């Protein structure tokens, strides 16, 4: 039987019912969220900054509150725990269903801790979520900021990176001039708000670039890094590939740096208007890669929301 926190002491039934409810896009109550996040914290605090992951696994990029597209992702990729998943951050903000999206992923983590890995993205932060929608959504759905606080406190425990079979390094953003090797990542103190600068910030904010070397990022955080940097990093750490998310790519995935780096983006028709495909990357037992592209799930009536979020695409 799949070992899980939910199944210990007979608690799985309640959690399974909650997962079923969440799959129908119905949020949990505030006390249920609090209990769930307490259990999740116990699991996540035991995980490494470079969390080891075995194949087969399906690697996913940004979701951004596009709940119905996450359900479509599970329909196409296989449901958890039949398929192992690795999500590379940015569960919240921009889409209309950040609450349901992040609650479902955390519930799956608690129920099947060995089957799903959830990394931190730059949007899993107190500051960013106050600007881009998650904070306002929590206020609207729960009447107070309590659930926002519960989740943003939990985000501090999400692992920063994962390592699939010692050869695919997965993270939300990209590389850092402060980090040459994986041990430098392992030694970071991650349990904090995402800093404005430094190695932890860079891992969640940086982007690959056509220009060599390190560059100043137009995002105002992190760096751009060239093919020379990726090649050196992969060589030093015996890696085949860096897989990351963080950037909208129209086909859902995009190779860079002569296939040393791949961007995976899993929110189709991003912000309900970009017209992009989404994709997920399946890594099988033999470590072969297959990209699966998908289009948006059929649109539901979107909730009546006053949009006051800036248009700058983080």
Curated annotation (Swiss-Prot):
Keyword list, A-Z: Cytoplasm, Hydrolase, Manganese, Metal-binding, Protein phosphatase
Intracellular or extracellular location(s): Cytoplasm
Known catalytic reactions: O-phospho-L-seryl-[protein] + H2O = L-seryl-[protein] + phosphate; O-phospho-L-threonyl-[protein] + H2O = L-threonyl-[protein] + phosphate
Positions contributing to Mn(2+) 2 binding: 90, 122, 172, 246
PROSITE patterns in UniProt: SER_THR_PHOSPHATASE
Cofactor requirements of the protein: Mn(2+)
GO molecular function, one term: protein serine/threonine phosphatase activity
UniProt-annotated binding residues for Mn(2+) 1: 62, 64, 90
EC code: 3.1.3.16
Entry annotation: catalytic residues: 123
A single GO BP: mitotic cell cycle
Cofactor note: Binds 2 manganese ions per subunit.
Top enzyme category: hydrolase
PANTHER family referenced in this protein's UniProt entry, alphabetically: SERINE/THREONINE-PROTEIN PHOSPHATASE PP2A-RELATED (PTHR45619)
Protein name per the record: Serine/threonine-protein phosphatase PP2A-4 catalytic subunit
Annotated source species: Oryza sativa subsp. japonica (Rice)
Organismal lineage: Eukaryota, Viridiplantae, Streptophyta, Embryophyta, Tracheophyta
Gene that encodes it: PP2A4
